[in-house]
């Protein structure tokens, strides 16, 4: 198994929130340790746990030392939910692979910087085009301000 395999799974998971996450984006997350998926999650509904949190809950202690594959950059600010970056750091994840940088100005690269600052290896851009197609409206709204 490789990064592409796990990111494809995260993209598939992101689709599960297609009709329930607006105005938030569809996001999927897979947590892998020793080439075994130990946690999966997706953003199920606006105002509820983000994909990373759902995957971390499923993984529990098995997340420590693992890799998180996320279709969109993890948030690092408090909104309706706490920052996903803090949860990833606290879990002991040591690597995060991100498909797309979040275009939301509140995040846009800040989540990546925060993770790196806390010693987490970050890789970006994996299957970006494939992942972005399931969030066309979100990316358009962030870029133009229009739905």
UniProtKB/Swiss-Prot annotation:
InterPro entries: APOBEC/CMP_deaminase_Zn-bd, CMP_dCMP_dom, Cytidine_deaminase-like, Eubact_RibD
Top-level taxon of origin: Bacteria
Recorded catalytic activity of this chain's protein: 2,5-diamino-6-hydroxy-4-(5-phosphoribosylamino)-pyrimidine + H2O + H(+) = 5-amino-6-(5-phospho-D-ribosylamino)uracil + NH4(+)
Residues that hold Zn(2+) according to the record: 50, 75, 84
UniProtKB keywords: Hydrolase, Metal-binding, Riboflavin biosynthesis, Zinc
Gene3D superfamilies: Cytidine Deaminase, domain 2 (3.40.140.10)
Residues annotated as catalytic: 52
Cofactor or coenzyme needed: Zn(2+)
Family to which this protein belongs: Belongs to the cytidine and deoxycytidylate deaminase family.
NCBIfam families, A to Z: eubact_ribD
The protein, known as: Diaminohydroxyphosphoribosylamino-pyrimidine deaminase
Organism: Buchnera aphidicola subsp. Acyrthosiphon pisum (strain APS) (Acyrthosiphon pisum symbiotic bacterium)
Taxonomy of the source species: Bacteria, Pseudomonadati, Pseudomonadota, Gammaproteobacteria, Enterobacterales
